[in-house]
Amino acid sequence: MLAGIAFSSSALAQDGEKKDKDYLVLHGSIQSDILMPEVDNKIGTGTYKDDILTNTYAELTLASKHFEVGGRFEFLEHPLPGFENDFKGWGVPHIYAKYNSGKGVEVTLGDVYDQFGSGLIFRTYEERSLGIDNAIRGGRVNISALKGVRFKALGGVQRRYWDWDTDSWVAGTDLEIDINQYSQKMRDNNVSWTIGGSYVLLNYEKNDQVVIPGTNYELNLPSNVNAFDVRSSLTVGNYNILAEYAWRSQDPSFDNGYIYRRGSAVLLSASYSSKGVSALVQAKRSENMSFRSNRSITGISGFINNMPAFAYQHTYSLPALYPYATQAAPGEWAFQGEFGYNFKRHTALGGKYGTKMKLNISHIRGLDKSPVEPVNGTLMGTDGYETCFFKTGELYYQDINVQMEKKLSKSFKLNLMYMNQKYNKTVIEGEGGMVKSNIAVAEGKYQINKKFTLRSELQYLWTNEDQGDWAFGLVELSALPYLMFTLSDMWNTGETNQHYYMGSVTATYKAHRLMLGYGRTRAGYNCSGGVCRYVPASKGVNISYNYTF
């Protein structure tokens, strides 16, 4: 049936290739991830009620020169392991209609994704690997009719899985101005300066009843929560400086222990980039910035904002074993620096083909807090704590890694990485203390001929904490243009001595991609952008199909 849909949709798309002449164009995608699970008590999979688990999505968009309508069907009735209970369901939860005048005015009705600035006070988005879809159902207006000026206004109710919480609604506006558009001198000197400001209102039509334990005192929860954001981005030649400040009014919630302290965030970023050299330095201080459309829920759903992650996003398996989750409610001081340099060809360190080096440092600490006087033994209903702006608390996370990319011959390329990591498992996961580890990675890629490429990875993690040492190996053979064969094993050489083996075959043909695999997956956290989802251990047949047209 899916193949039939794909064929007919592709045919319709070919009928309208020239959108500029107001033809109708149909495009979309299908994504289906399937697990046929097996019980494996050695790795703690637990038992399953269903023989087949799947997360399946199908999107369709019909567009012309000025109009666009779209929707997404989701079948999550028997979801993959590790998603929250309310994630289960099926239907068409995402629909929209959009009008674009072609003269700087765009109007959208339905479900909206958007972001103000860096997302400190507003970001709605979809991230399927985490099970996040926090779209606003309502409307949005974008206006860019004036030179260098972009304005947007939106409002509606927020999606939380298969529920749209009508007990609250969200509205917001955002304005950005490119100052350089009004200065010929700035443009002549390659200077770009953008300033922006945002406002978000969260209104509760109905408030929860929260009583301080041991008393009859019910908290007077605010019906309106206001948030503001101002920012400035200046680019001069190869240099860029970004500064952003966000503030949120009182919002007692489950996340912050129902305290009345206001939230704030400051973000500073400076970068430089030229041929062969790049540098980035960032700092962020956030405090009590968990911001949801429902103040009593937990987990990863219902967020109106998203605090940017200041930890390096690793793609290798063992460096990603202990990923950092942004601590939005407690707050954090986060620092990140990155320096990259390309040694030129035919130099002592560059060799025949050149060498790429990169150093990344992430250092994240808590805030130094002094609790206020409790009421009946609890901080509920109080400001919670006092803090000094520049003082830091305990270490949450640290990652120092060095990476090298080196082409040794026309057919062989070598990547090396060393990483030193400190991971406060008690803060990030709830228990476990500080995990200190050292990780080494070697990746080789050998092009056998124009059709076949062999890639391999060897990784090792040393630690005296948690489950001890880990080893990882991978071999991958690509047979262009259609097939890829992969074998891997993650082995806990420390505490459990368990192997997490996996074998897969991936086939690609035009816009189709099909992966068939079998093996084990270890329990752990899947993270993206500082948001993490716990994924339990699993074993079985994995099937993944993707098609885009």
PLM regions and their residue ranges:
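Exposed, low-structure sequence patches enriched in small/polar residues
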Residues: Q31, M186-N190, L221-F549
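Outer membrane beta-barrel
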Residues: T61-Q158, K185-R187, K275-S296, Q467, ...
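Short glycine/proline- and aromatic-enriched beta-strand/turn motifs that initiate or cap beta-hairpins
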Residues: K19-G46, S362-I364
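Outer-membrane beta-barrel proteins
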Residues: L76, L80-F87, Y161-W164, R248-R261
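Hydrophobic, small-residue-rich alpha-helical packing segments that form membrane-like cores
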Residues: I132-L219, S223-F228, S233
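Bacterial Sec-dependent N-terminal signal peptides
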Residues: M1-V25, F549
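Short loop/turn motifs that connect adjacent beta-strands in outer-membrane beta-barrel proteins
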Residues: Q14-L26, L62-H66, Y99-T108, L146-V149, ...
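Surface-exposed strand-loop-strand hairpins of Gram-negative outer-membrane beta-barrel proteins
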Residues: I34-L53, T378, D383-F389
